[in-house]
A protein has these predicted regions:
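Histidine (H) residue identity feature
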Residues: 11, 18, 54-55, 79, ...
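Short N-terminal or domain-adjacent regulatory/targeting segments
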Residues: 9-36
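Active-site cavity-forming subdomains of large catalytic enzyme subunits
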Residues: 91-202
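Long, structured ligand/cofactor-binding scaffold of large enzymes
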Residues: 28-141
Length: 202
């Protein structure tokens, strides 16, 4: 890694700066000077991104696995992307997430990365960034959300939304009913469960 390259008398000041600032939360100088690979975990889950929110827990398991295999784990957040919460469009965020990942993967002392994804924005952003940075990478998808139920009928994130919109426009359901019907389509965290790009690319 870049950190190990700069761990030398020829670059003493840079070595000190690189090493010292990573010693304040549990890493040791011996670890950082051991030559062991530094594996990043690009964590895409947050309260703003419920599609990927479970990656906050899964990232800890990834961290444990990296340590078990002899690596040094360093976790960092990805730019948040959530299709339905972002206005005017989440498509712009895909590019921001990509650019942020490229800068992180190329500018920090990282030898490899585990990219946590789960929708049709975080997945391409992560894949493009890994290809651009040209470092070893594993993509971990969180999987789709569960199917929902409403009045005994199975509901899904795409078809039910269009049906609910039509029912509301006709006056067949009121606004709270509109919210309840659409809300039934997202009973758990995970990416959209329809045959759209979130499912096909994950």
């Amino acid at each position: 890694s870049e950190m190990c390259i700069r761990d030398s008398p020829e670059h003493s000041e840079l070595s000190v700066l690189h090493l010292a600032w990573y010693l304040n939360y549990g890493l040791t100088r011996e670890e950082l000077q051991s030559g062991r690979p530094i594996i990043a975990i690009a964590q895409s889950g947050s309260d703003l991104t419920p599609c990927n929110r479970h990656h906050r827990e899964l990232a800890q398991r990834v961290r444990d696995g990296i340590r078990e295999m002899g690596g040094i784990a360093m976790e960092f957040p990805m730019h948040p992307i959530q299709e339905n919460g972002r206005r005017p469009t989440a498509a712009l965020d895909r590019n921001l997430a990509y650019l942020g990942l490229v800068e992180t993967l190329t500018g920090y002392p990282i030898d490899g990365v585990v990219l946590t994804t789960g929708c049709d924005k975080t997945t391409p952003a992560a894949l493009m960034a890994a290809a651009t940075a040209n470092i070893p990478a594993i993509v971990l998808s969180g999987g789709p959300m569960l199917n929902g139920w409403h009045d005994g009928q199975r509901t899904g994130t795409g078809t039910t939304l269009f049906k609910a919109r039509e029912l509301f426009a006709k006056g067949s359901i009121d606004f709270p009913g509109y919210i309840d019907l659409v809300g039934s389509t997202v009973p758990s965290i995970g990416h959209c469960n329809v045959m759209g790009t979130a499912s096909t690319m994950n």
